[in-house]
């Protein structure tokens, strides 16, 4: 980052500290969802710099705009409804347009909190930058417990993915207002993997009119586990999901859901030794993917106890509630365009998840785009440029 951008960043910090980002008078104010707690500059790029950056990440955008990025910490709610905070990335295109269309991009599975989009998550950051480079305002929620958010991350918990994403929209609107710009109320929503579930959860809230001042303009979700009980959990057990990926998914999901639904009293009820003694520590948000996977076995049958293998296949009680609470992201009807992108070659999130979504209420108006015989990571690289092109044709940035 050059000296000019560094000086601009320092000036932004000083201005924000004295203004909307909070002084002493803010400490005692009542909690308000979407209210800004703090703002910090992350980077600023000119048009040519943005173009070079996206070319390096293989998300090229023709005639890319300059982009300014902010890390926003804002007020939201925890899984039990109590006040908490979360962070997210807000990107503003360097254009003369005062009224901007907004894109919300929800990121994929992240085990380390500092790999969230507003922190050091360069891969997910680049995916968000492409929308701002095209002239949209863009946001990327970190979700609860990642980035600057306190506590542990409630992995794949659709209700809090939706609330954290929705409240970031409110924070972004306030930030843009301070810059004398406004957001069009129609939001374009997209996301990948875990973020596909989050995207549809947010889209449902926008369609239902529960996000003040915002509605849904279009949604495009890529390779999401929309049906944990009927598809994703069984596939993790029967080999459709590759072994280590299945272990990562089940270990992350079970430990996260235990904090909300209390699916076990002791890790030894769910996990075999020696993994029962270490698994909660591995998913503490401070271990990277290599550390997590190297500390766990290569198959669910080696990870889970017989009781929890049976529970994953035929859930009851708290496990069933945990699945059902997040398996509703396709149970709504849309009157705006919705696309689901998925691949038959995906060994992390089977294609059947999207097929199941198409059989739900959303399927009556959604379109399923088959990306072919490619694996999970390739789906987002293939789909996102298509999604940007679709957004630009149907809902131009300004």
Segments from the language model and where they lie:
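Catalytic-loop region of hydrolases
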Residues: 5, 22-98
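C-terminal motif of bacterial Sec signal peptides marking the signal peptidase cleavage site
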Residues: 17-20
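Short, surface-exposed "cap/lid" segments of acyl-processing enzymes
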Residues: 78-87, 91-135, 148
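Gly/Ser-rich "nucleophile elbow"/oxyanion-hole loop immediately N-terminal to the catalytic nucleophile
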Residues: 92-99, 171-190, 211
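Alpha/beta-hydrolase active-site loop
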Residues: 155-178
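Accessory cap/linker subdomain of secreted extracellular hydrolases
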Residues: 222-331
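C-terminal catalytic histidine-bearing segment of alpha/beta-hydrolase fold enzymes
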Residues: 312-315, 319-322, 326, 336, ...
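Short beta-strand/loop motif that positions the catalytic acidic residue
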Residues: 334, 339-346
């Amino acid at each position: 980052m050059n000296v000019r951008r560094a000086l601009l960043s320092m000036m932004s910090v000083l201005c924000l500290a004295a203004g909307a980002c909070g002084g002493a008078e803010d400490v005692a104010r009542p909690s308000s969802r979407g209210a800004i707690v703090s703002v910090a500059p992350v980077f600023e790029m000119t048009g040519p710099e943005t173009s070079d950056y996206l070319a390096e990440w293989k998300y090229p955008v023709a005639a890319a705009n300059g982009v300014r990025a902010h890390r926003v910490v804002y007020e939201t709610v925890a899984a039990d409804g109590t006040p908490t905070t979360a962070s997210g990335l807000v990107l503003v295109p360097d254009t003369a347009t005062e009224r901007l269309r907004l894109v919300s991009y929800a990121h994929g599975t992240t085990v380390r909190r500092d790999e969230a989009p507003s922190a050091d998550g360069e891969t997910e950051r680049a995916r968000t930058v492409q929308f701002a480079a095209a002239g949209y305002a863009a946001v990327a929620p970190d979700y609860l417990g990642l980035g600057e958010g306190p506590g542990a991350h409630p992995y794949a918990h659709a209700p809090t993915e939706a609330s954290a994403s929705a409240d970031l929209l409110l924070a972004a609107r306030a930030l843009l207002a301070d810059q004398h710009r406004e957001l069009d109320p129609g939001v374009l929503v997209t996301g990948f993997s875990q973020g596909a579930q989050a995207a549809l959860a947010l889209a449902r809230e926008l369609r239902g009119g529960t996000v003040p001042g915002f509605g849904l303009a279009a949604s495009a979700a890529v390779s999401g586990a929309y049906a944990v009980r009927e598809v994703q959990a069984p596939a993790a057990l029967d080999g459709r999901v590759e072994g280590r990926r299945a272990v990562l998914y089940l270990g992350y999901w079970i430990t996260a859901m235990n904090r909300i639904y209390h699916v076990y009293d002791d890790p030894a009820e769910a996990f075999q030794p020696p993994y029962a003694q270490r698994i909660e520590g591995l998913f503490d948000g401070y271990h990277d993917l290599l550390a997590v996977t190297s500390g766990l076995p290569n198959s669910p049958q080696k990870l889970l106890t017989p009781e929890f293998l049976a529970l994953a296949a035929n859930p009851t009680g708290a496990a069933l509630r945990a699945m059902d609470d997040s398996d509703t992201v396709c149970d709504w009807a849309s009157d705006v365009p919705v696309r689901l992108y998925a691949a038959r070659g995906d060994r992390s999130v089977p294609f059947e998840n999207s097929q199941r979504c198409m059989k739900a209420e959303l399927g009556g108006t959604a379109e399923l785009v088959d990306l072919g015989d490619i694996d999970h990571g390739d789906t987002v690289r293939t789909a996102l440029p298509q999604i940007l092109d679709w957004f630009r044709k149907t809902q131009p940035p300004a």
